[in-house]
Amino acid sequence: MGRAVGIDLGTTNSCIATLEGGEPTVIVNAEGARTTPSVVAFSKSGEILVGEVAKRQAVTNVDRTISSVKRHMGTDWTVDIDGKEWTPQEISAQILMKLKRDAEAYLGEPVTDAVITCPAYFNDAQRQATKDAGTIAGLNVLRIINEPTAAALAYGLEKSKEDERILVFDLGGGTFDVSLLEIGKDDDGFSTIQVQATSGDNHLGGDDWDQRIIDWLVGEVKNKYGVDLSKDKIALQRLKEAAEQAKKELSSSMSTTINMQYLAMTPDGTPVHLDETLTRAHFEEMTKDLLDRCRTPFNNVLADAGISVSQIDHVILVGGSTRMPAVKELVKELDGGKEANQSVNPDEVVAIGAAVQSGVIKGDRKDVLLIDVTPLSLGIETKGGIMTKLIERNTAIPAKRSEIFSTAEDNQPSVLIQVYQGEREFARDNKPLGTFELTGIAPAPRGVPQIEVTFDIDANGIVHVSAKDKGTGKEQSMTITGGSALPKEEIDQMIKDAEAHEADDKKRKEDAETRNNAENFAYQTEKLVNDNKDKLSDDVAKSVTDAINELKDALKGDDIEKIKAAQEKLMTEAQKIGQALYAQQGAEGAAGAADSGSANNGGDDDVVDAEVVDDDDKDNK
């Protein structure tokens, strides 16, 4: 019988742990380290390298080295290596296989079962991809559990206090999660850990802080040498490694020096050297907006749980990125001035918690009960494009819910079940998970057939859906498999703030009309200037053109008020065109004035109203 392990499959680093005598132990890898870089490389000879050895050769093998693949999980992203398309699941499986091999060498016995962690805010496709990676690696995946939950599990085992409410602030290399949990322990030492709420951002992590340093260094080189390194893959890889190191050094020092020789060559053959000093203050200034993105999930969790900051006993920091001083200060600010609890190792605590859960599932530990939640609501599209939710977010899992629906037309022979995940009121604004059809419905007037739709979320957070015609007994079901069905750009987090989204929905039509009107006005005014260049003075043409360009620049952004202001300015400037044309034509006499009136009427024809889409049409789209 093989051993069970817990694996933290991270964006930047991964970690594996197991139970020894009922207690969790981190397993060191073949290189003697307790964490393994989540990097996979393919050597020119075809050998697959994983971990530190892959990371070390990245500069000389840029195109065949893959890092941060976790950010692509659940998408259709692939990388071509020697004619083979590698999916994120397959790349991740190579990391898991390395961890599995090292664990087997350490333990001296086969490793067969694993609990693998994923961000709490991973959607169904991303969770399924994580499970698939484990299967490809030859592991029996006992469970997919959320990283903050695993961290709380590890933390809770050491606590003697009977009841504690903790908030896990998990900022890793590529993802960010916040989870609120209650930990209780009875007189017999039995621990109950229950998740109350969770929120996050699947595209926020230490990689983004690194990228800001890289962008700054690229800009410095361009300013000094006139060389653009943004297309130089080898130079970028060197900058990436230097940026990561600089970020780490700034966690303990107020400044750091980045010194790199022979980064590139100028067109005249001069070597490009880099010698820059980056202060912590400058680093924090250039990443302030990233830090601010951590606020909303924190506040959302408190709102969803219906508690105040004062009701949190401890905030636990998880993930290597929480070592940054600015992050610690933010947590202190959000937590009402209290210092965060730093009693756990942020790099290892998730794997330790996963190992404990593997022991619970295998029966090696019987003193823990873990109750997790689904981070996003699940539902189907009903008439009018409405998202009808069957399972609300933050529902404890496993969970099963059923609801009766009917047909929308007389004698309707089938119904299309379209499954979505998210918090928006309209299905089109949420993430599609899958579609299936229930056929063979007996002829009947609309509203008479009874179609029972059932959602079942297993302990992994993976969704199973079924539909049954209660009249005929016919049934159709599906397991959401995710993966390549979801485009990359649609893996962004699915919920920010439900109230904010409602406000966005109400403003959407107004904002769209404002933008359309502004675009049309800019186009028509520019056309009028071009058609009458010989009749306008240079000053008038320039002032109007400048206003047109200002409006165009505003239209590139999302600030509606800025667009309105720019349009009003252009309307004022555009009046000068009419004044100039009237003045010129007035000088030509009465006939000219008549022509001017005709031209003015023609000018009205140039104004194009924005298209108005009928509400019924919108619902049918």
From Swiss-Prot:
It holds the Pfam family HSP70. Gene3D superfamilies: 1.20.1270.10, 3.30.420.40, Actin, Chain A, domain 4, Substrate Binding Domain Of DNAk, Chain A, domain 1. The keyword Phosphoprotein applies. Residues 603-621 have a biased composition (Acidic residues). Residues 583-602 have a biased composition (Low complexity). It comes from the Bacteria. GO terms for molecular function: ATP binding; ATP-dependent protein folding chaperone; unfolded protein binding. The modification Phosphothreonine is found at residue 175. Induction: By stress conditions e.g. heat shock. Residues 499-516 have a biased composition (Basic and acidic residues). Residues 499-520, 583-621 are annotated as: Disordered. Coiled coil: none annotated. Keywords: ATP-binding, Chaperone, Nucleotide-binding, Phosphoprotein, Stress response. Acts as a chaperone. Belongs to the heat shock protein 70 family. This is Chaperone protein DnaK. The lineage of its organism: Bacteria, Bacillati, Actinomycetota, Actinomycetes, Bifidobacteriales.
